[in-house]
Amino acid sequence: MPDTLELEVATPERELVREQVTEVQVPAAQGYLGVLPGHAPLLGLLGIGTLTYMVGGNKRHISVHGGFLEVLEDHVRVLADVAERAEEIDIQRAKAALERSQREALNPALGVDPAEALAATMRAEARLATADKK
């Protein structure tokens, strides 16, 4: 069994990661999934949260929002709708987005779909949680 697996994280705009890692934790649609080398193959939906991976004993973090996940014995491919490395996240912008989405969720008169407001809140919270891990 291999000691590492190749991790690829990409969005429609860019590739964020392509490197050998020892472990990956991915926010899947039904909760977090831990992947080690030799994992059983699977396809899944990506959730909203922090993708964490280990390289040389160091943890690295990426905020991901929606997309797809493919796991093979020696490879993890994440195709995210949106992804940002922890160090790329603009904390002030994420805080402003969180405040705006919470305001929209609590005020139906603003005309924002409650499901959209909730999703925006979850995305902003995930970005802030990821940024906090850098």
From Swiss-Prot:
It is a peripheral membrane protein. Produces ATP from ADP in the presence of a proton gradient across the membrane. Keywords: ATP synthesis, Cell inner membrane, Cell membrane, CF(1), Hydrogen ion transport, Ion transport, Membrane, Transport. This is ATP synthase epsilon chain. Its main location: membrane. GO terms for molecular function: ATP binding; proton-transporting ATP synthase activity, rotational mechanism. It holds the Pfam family ATP-synt_DE_N. One of its GO terms (cellular component) is proton-transporting ATP synthase complex. InterPro entries: ATP_synth_F1_dsu/esu, ATP_synth_F1_dsu/esu_N, ATPsynth_dsu/esu_N. Belongs to the ATPase epsilon chain family. It is found in: Cell inner membrane. F-type ATPases have 2 components, CF(1) - the catalytic core - and CF(0) - the membrane proton channel. CF(1) has five subunits: alpha(3), beta(3), gamma(1), delta(1), epsilon(1). CF(0) has three main subunits: a, b and c.
